[in-house]
Amino acid sequence: MQNSPALQAAQRLARSWLAGEHLDDLPPPLRPRSLEEGRAIQALWAGVVGDAIAGWKIAATSEAGQRHIAVAGPIAGPVFARRVVCDGATVSLAGNRMRVAECEVVFTIGRTLDPRPQPYSRSEVLAAVQWLHPGIKVPDSRFREFERAGEAQLAADCACCNDMVLGAAVAPDERIQALPALVVQARVSDGRTPQGAGRNVLGDPVAALCWLANELRASGRALEAGQFVTTGACVAPIAVLPGQRVEADFGWIGRIAASFA
């Protein structure tokens, strides 16, 4: 693995992320040719950045999102501990080309789901959930034209991982079965009031969580106890600028806010 093309690609992408810089594309010798090669590059990021994986994100959990970045389905990526902040935090948009806030249902896992041959069922995944949270994800890509980078490079790019605002925890109860009907009301300081629902995330945030657990399982990785999964945008991505603030009400799951600088 030492000085392999995959490691060189991970180094180039991760260092661009740390520096707030962007690339046109990975050079051909380093460019992944498949989703599997992209995942292999992604798996090397943690060692390059020297940080723990606090949780996992899912990009493109709606048909509109998949069309926007020209991918066939969702893409998973890690969220690193250094970029997780609490409710009410201010997030810098310096170097961020996407400049959107995404209001998402988040699950914290209380029991590790290890790799195994057979897929995890919905009931098994739900039994591993310890907490739910409201969340605001602030993605970005290392690629200047992320819309045309392709799913292999976007997987290598950790599915546009960047900043995560994580709200207070609430214990799961029977209402977790009704998340498709959950209304999420956002408010932006400029007067916009976009609204969405849990059904916008693969039909159900729990379905997205199950997809992520089995995506990791299939690639030989565990969804570890203590990690969170942010499941995708319930509300269409909200364009934000420095000086603005976004608040989101997730009903029984709670409220969250983030300011931007």
Description of each model-found segment:
Residues 2-203, 241, 245, 255-261:
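Catalytic-core "active-site belt" of small-molecule-metabolizing enzymes
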Residues 205-237:
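A conserved acidic, glycine/proline-rich C-terminal tail/linker
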Residues 188-189, 231, 251:
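Short strand-turn-strand beta-turns centered on an Asx-Gly dipeptide
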Residues 234-238, 252-255:
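Short, charged beta-turn/beta-strand-edge "cap" motif at the junction between a beta-strand
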Residues 248:
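Carbohydrate-binding surfaces in secreted/extracellular proteins
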